Amino acid sequence: MGQYVIIENGGRYCYNLCASNGHVLVNSIVFPSRDECLKSIDEMRDTASTAGIEDSTEDAFDRIPSPKYRIYETMDGKYFFRFITSMAGDVARSHEYPKKESLLRRIERMRSECDSSLARQD
């Protein structure tokens, strides 16, 4: 199992979902409070394992309801996704990958590790 790691900076909070192998699966947006950050983690735990995939790199792609993984392509041909929830919208972003297949494997990894626990903080 992976871990959610909360980071605090100046009274604002974000989190990383780290896979069991230590790789960061996604980085969250910045939240104004720890409670909102924790709510986002709870929603991700509840929905990320069954969320659909919307591939905006395809011509005339079909829009699907949230929660979902929306795939994007950068100007230099790399791929990343954003995780979009039905309650809070766009809450997390993946790293960029040179191949879409690598990105799809990362989505599957996130689906299997989204119910991870919160890292212990001292």
Report the location of each language-model feature.
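Short, surface-exposed linear patches
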Residues: 38-39, 47-54, 92, 103-106, ...
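Short amphipathic alpha-helical linker/capping segments at the junctions of internal repeats
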Residues: 32-38, 56-60, 99-104
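Long terminal segments
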Residues: 76, 99-104, 111-122
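A structural feature that tracks compact, well-ordered secondary-structure segments
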Residues: 3-7, 14-31, 40-43, 68-72, ...
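Intrinsic disorder/low-complexity detector
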Residues: 1-10, 22-23, 45-77, 117-122
